[in-house]
């Protein structure tokens, strides 16, 4: 089972003006053997606000609103879980092996958010899940369990 197989939906945030990133993302999926099934795996049109409205930048607000939009969509669709990616995703060369291990471990545990894209500290030959109780500053590759979406 690959990483995308496990999730009800996978959404990739893409600014409509960045067609180059859209093409690169499709190629990245193909390189790693991930099917690009438009019912299950699809692009989400990034929110592009005109004002920062209290966020550090317009881009930060747009990023937040895009991720929030995907979570709201997941609630409407009543998904069991969702994988969220950004259009600059570059999978590890070990994604097949580590992705399968990650999915197998998720199937046997209670989880709310699984973050796949955080730099790993320590022995990267056998990655493990770590509980995190501090902010994570990147949001390019993570999953949310449907049972916790409304709490976010």
Predicted features along the sequence, with ranges:
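An acidic/histidine-cluster motif and surrounding catalytic segment
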Residues: 1-85, 89-152
